[in-house]
C-alpha cells in the first residue's frame, strides 16, 4: 500500500487543475504544465484537492500510484512557488557569464562552453570578490530544472583531489589523499 500515494494533494487558490482524457493540465501564476497518466491510475479532482487512486493492486500500478501523486504535487508546487538550483564554480579562473539566458562558461578548457537554456528557466550569475562564482537556476518545471543543472555540472564534475569543478551548493565531495612520499 502506497503511503505517499494516499495523501491528497492540496490545490492553492491561484492554481487551476483540469483533467482531459489521460492528461492532467496544471496552470498557475508562474506557468503551465501537463502530465500524461499511463496505467490504471484514477485522478479525482475535488474542490481544493486531488486524490490519486489505483484501479488494480498489481506491482506496476502500486509503483505508479506514488509516482504520479508526487509528480502532480511537484507540478502544483512549481507553478505556484517555483524551484531553484544553485551551482558553484570552484577553481582558479573559472568564470560564468549570463547573456540573455545563454550561459557562457570558462571552466579550464581551451574554449568557452556556451549553453542555451530553455525559455522556462531563468538564469542568474553571482560573482563576488574572494568568493566562488554561483550559478542560480530558477524554473517552475522541476524535471527540466534538474536535467539542465545536471548537464551543467557534468561539464566539469568536482575532482576528488582538490575539489575543483562545478558542484551544487552544499554538495559534499569526498577527497582522496595524494601520493605519499617514501
Curated annotation (Swiss-Prot):
Keyword NADP: no
GO MF annotation list: rRNA binding; structural constituent of ribosome
Gene Ontology cellular-component terms listed: cytosolic large ribosomal subunit
Listed Gene3D superfamilies: Ribosomal protein L6, alpha-beta domain
BP term (GO), one: cytoplasmic translation
Keyword terms, alphabetized: Ribonucleoprotein, Ribosomal protein, RNA-binding, rRNA-binding
Secretion signal span: none
The UniProt record lists the keyword Ribonucleoprotein: yes
Pfam assignment, any one: Ribosomal_L6
PROSITE patterns: RIBOSOMAL_L6_1
Assembly notes: Part of the 50S ribosomal subunit.
Family: Belongs to the universal ribosomal protein uL6 family.
Function field: This protein binds to the 23S rRNA, and is important in its secondary structure. It is located near the subunit interface in the base of the L7/L12 stalk, and near the tRNA binding site of the peptidyltransferase center.
Name of this chain's protein: Large ribosomal subunit protein uL6
Species whose genome carries this gene: Karelsulcia muelleri (strain GWSS)
